[in-house]
Amino acid sequence: MKTLSEDRRALHRIPETGCRLPETAAYLRGALAEMPCTLLAPWEDAVCAYFDLGKDETVAVRSDMDALPVTERTGLPFASAHPGRMHACGHDGHMAMVLGLARRLAAGEIRPQRNVLLIFEPAEETTGGAAPICATGLLERYHVTRVFGMHLWPELPAGVIASRAGAMMSRSCELTVEITGRSVHLARFAEGCDALDAAARLLTRLYALAEGKPCLLRFGKMESGSARNAVSDHTHLEGSLRCLDDGLYAALWEQAQAIGRAVGEETGCTVTMTCKIGRAHV
């Protein structure tokens, strides 16, 4: 447990984002280099370690590596040393856990019925590193028949592992909304097309659409207007749509676009909604 904690805290201090994670990758390679495994670098700063146990098949265990663009204000002695970046989603813990597995394999404390491939994936929070890693043929080359992953869940009691049949983690989609209106002085607002008003209507209706459904439809960023005394002529919104069910996902996106068209007609604004589809549910 001491080594797990030390690894987690060391990794917590050096959070990096995206697919270029030189410090994180160096830490992992340094720890794994002492073990009887083959180190691999299939894509960008991904780190993989292959433990050959002389079996025909291989099982893979995967951890994400990247952090979030969040400023840490915990005041902890092992807090982030990189301003504006933080392991706020538990990936430091995931890496420490997989390193712990590697140490047990190296020490012969466990003898699986298959070879073991450990995969540390960059860019999980952004573009996703899994697809480009798979595209290298890594899984086929090492005869991987199954891949296991996990995610820390602070709401669960200590020592409890939760799972279920079917989808566990949702499909994701990055939503972007551009609303274009016409700016006039606030005193003559009725002569303009208020992009901020349109955004407010759109937000409240989209949130109402998702209420009570097994999904997430929320926006985390909105930028609008240029002056306190002028009607906004442009609003930019960024959000996320996540669902466990593909049918619900498609229905919500169709209804969201219909709401956007209705708001545009009501306000005289042009409402453009785009959906960048992310990875499928797991």
Where are the model-predicted features located?
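Acidic/His- and Gly-rich active-site-bordering loop/insert found
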Residues: 1-87, 96, 103-112
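Generic structural signal for well-ordered, non-membrane alpha-helical segments
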Residues: 1-4, 17, 21-25, 94, ...
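Alpha-helical scaffold segments in soluble metabolic enzymes
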Residues: 6, 10, 27-30, 100, ...
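Conserved beta-strand termini and adjacent loop/short-helix elements that scaffold enzyme active sites
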Residues: 42-44, 121, 274-276
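A structural signal for isolated positions on well-ordered beta-strands in alpha/beta enzyme cores
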Residues: 60, 117-119, 272
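Histidine/acidic-residue-rich, glycine-tolerant segments that coordinate divalent metal ions
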Residues: 68-70, 76-86, 92-93, 108-221, ...
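Metal-dependent amide/peptide-bond hydrolase catalytic core
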Residues: 196-281
